[in-house]
């Protein structure tokens, strides 16, 4: 697929520290966070003017789903806009708490595990054609996704019976199946529930739930960009070596526990390969594919360059090559500097605190944003683009229609209902427009509906 629709959903961890007598449960904190949303949207599940969806997920986790984007860079801008929107709700909730005499600070973490060992996710969505064989797509993708953490993990200090260790991925410990239609009960690598949010005869939505949530824009670029290239190869029928894993679930944990990428995992055919070798195989094929197909645009070149440098860095152990660009390395080096300075063991509570503070989305407190302010991390988006994306939808996808419809309906104080495919005015006529094509950003039916308000 030359032009693909992408979407990211991030669930955020909520916590609150209190200095007074009154303590609030995560549920109550989440209600404070969403009070402003509920006051104008009459629900804790709303679509916004930028085409995105914001809602309170199971277990009081706020979740932000980006609008449909047709470029990886735009996807990153909109994912970051989601962080900024939630940061705004955070400030609001703290102000409300203080007005009610409750002394406390609310924290939102863009990570994947809390201190109680619960996991919440970052789900990636890729639109794929209906014609291909979905099971083949999944088979070829699983070895890629199991080892992909090496290039885009968020890193985690994991407590084990033998002491604390630094792992590459946060999500790896919480994945229990390869392919499944459930997301919460059994966490698979690829979720097969068939909800394309588009013309079901033409499209399917590939729902990848194995990835970590990323703070780094460049890590996000590599995560989604490399996956898109692998998908394009599979769609084009490129022959790839059979790297089916004997036990993907065991492999995903083994890969996460090995920062060198050298440890061998068993393949279904009895051979053994390291995570690094598996990634190098996909990378080489993707680079040759991009070359042959004339796909070497600036954006693709940047993805391939970062992919290659990351594999070189892991292979040689020279992590400085990617110390400004890949989350798990940025965080690892931050922790190592701190440990050396304070003579701390990996298991020290202050190290665990640092691990968590990296993911704090508050730009005044979060460690990732402290590094960003100091110019210590690379960017792909600008602050202005992110600010605009808080209220302006992508202009080249269906999100534009949804965003314009919501904006007009709110301005005219009209009662309306929207989801990913429907736009409905709740008046006598109950007029509804069904938008099945996610690539269409212009539709006279929607324009008619908007101008009738």
Swiss-Prot record:
- An individual GO BP term: protein pupylation
Q: Does the keyword Nucleotide-binding apply?
A: yes
**Which positions bind ATP?**
53, 66, 420
Q: Which residues bind Mg(2+)?
A: 9, 55, 63
| Pathway annotation | Protein degradation; proteasomal Pup-dependent pathway; Protein modification; protein pupylation
Q: What EC number(s) would the UniProt record show? A: 6.3.1.19
- UniProt key word Lipid biosynthesis: no
What reactions does this protein catalyze?
Answer: ATP + [prokaryotic ubiquitin-like protein]-L-glutamate + [protein]-L-lysine = ADP + phosphate + N(6)-([prokaryotic ubiquitin-like protein]-gamma-L-glutamyl)-[protein]-L-lysine
Superkingdom classification of source: Bacteria
Please give the InterPro entries that the UniProt record associates with this protein: Pup_ligase, Pup_ligase/deamidase
Keywords carried by this UniProt record: ATP-binding, Ligase, Magnesium, Metal-binding, Nucleotide-binding, Ubl conjugation pathway
Q: Name one GO molecular function term.
A: ATP binding
Q: Where is the active site?
A: 57
Pfam families on file: Pup_ligase (PF03136)
Family assignment? Belongs to the Pup ligase/Pup deamidase family. Pup-conjugating enzyme subfamily.
* HAMAP family according to UniProt: Pup_ligase
Briefly, what is this protein's role?
Catalyzes the covalent attachment of the prokaryotic ubiquitin-like protein modifier Pup to the proteasomal substrate proteins, thereby targeting them for proteasomal degradation. This tagging system is termed pupylation. The ligation reaction involves the side-chain carboxylate of the C-terminal glutamate of Pup and the side-chain amino group of a substrate lysine.
Additional note from the record: The reaction mechanism probably proceeds via the activation of Pup by phosphorylation of its C-terminal glutamate, which is then subject to nucleophilic attack by the substrate lysine, resulting in an isopeptide bond and the release of phosphate as a good leaving group.
Q: What is this protein called?
A: Pup--protein ligase
Q: Which species expresses this protein natively?
A: Catenulispora acidiphila (strain DSM 44928 / JCM 14897 / NBRC 102108 / NRRL B-24433 / ID139908)
């Amino acid at each position: 697929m030359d032009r693909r629709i992408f979407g990211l959903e991030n669930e955020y961890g909520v916590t609150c520290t209190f200095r007074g007598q009154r303590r609030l449960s995560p549920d109550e904190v989440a209600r404070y966070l969403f009070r402003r949303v509920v006051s104008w949207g009459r629900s804790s599940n709303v679509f916004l003017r930028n085409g995105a969806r914001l809602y309170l997920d199971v277990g009081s986790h706020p979740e932000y789903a980006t609008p449909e984007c047709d470029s990886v860079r735009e996807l990153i801008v909109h994912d970051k806009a989601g962080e900024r929107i939630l940061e705004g709700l955070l400030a609001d909730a703290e102000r409300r708490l203080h007005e009610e005499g409750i002394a406390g600070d609310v924290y939102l973490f863009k990570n994947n595990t809390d201190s109680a060992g619960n996991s919440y996710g970052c789900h990636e969505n890729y639109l794929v054609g209906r014609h291909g064989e979905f099971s083949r797509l999944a088979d070829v993708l699983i070895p890629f996704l199991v080892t992909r953490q090496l290039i885009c993990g968020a890193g985690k200090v994991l407590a084990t019976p033998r002491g604390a260790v630094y792992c590459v991925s946060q999500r790896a410990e919480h994945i229990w199946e390869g392919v499944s239609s459930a997301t919460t009960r059994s966490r698979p690598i690829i979720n097969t529930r068939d909800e394309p949010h588009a013309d079901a005869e033409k499209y399917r939505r590939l729902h990848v739930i194995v990835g970590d949530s990323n703070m780094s824009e460049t890590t996000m670029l590599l995560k989604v960009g490399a996956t898109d290239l692998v998908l394009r190869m599979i769609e084009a029928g490129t022959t790839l070596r059979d790297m089916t894993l004997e036990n993907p679930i065991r492999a995903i944990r083994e890969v996460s526990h090995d920062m060198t990428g050298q440890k061998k995992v068993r393949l279904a055919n009895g051979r053994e390969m390291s995570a690094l070798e598996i990634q190098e195989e996909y990378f080489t094929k993707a680079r040759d594919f991009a070359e042959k197909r004339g796909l070497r645009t600036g954006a693709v070149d940047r993805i391939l360059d970062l992919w290659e440098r990351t594999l070189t860095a892991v292979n040689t152990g020279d992590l400085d090559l990617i110390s400004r660009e890949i989350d798990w390395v940025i965080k690892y080096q931050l922790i190592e500097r701190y440990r050396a300075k304070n003579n701390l063991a990996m298991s020290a509570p202050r190290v665990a605190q640092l691990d968590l503070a990296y993911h704090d989305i508050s730009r005044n407190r979060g460690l990732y944003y402290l590094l960003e302010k100091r110019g210590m991390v690379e960017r792909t988006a600008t602050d202005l683009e992110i600010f605009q994306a808080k209220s302006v939808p992508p202009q080249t996808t269906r999100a534009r229609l949804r965003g314009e419809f919501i904006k007009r309906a709110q301005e005219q104080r009209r009662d309306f209902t929207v989801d990913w495919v429907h736009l409905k005015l709740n008046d006598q006529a109950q007029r509804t427009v069904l938008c099945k094509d996610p690539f269409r950003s212009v539709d006279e039916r929607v324009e008619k509906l908007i101008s009738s308000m």
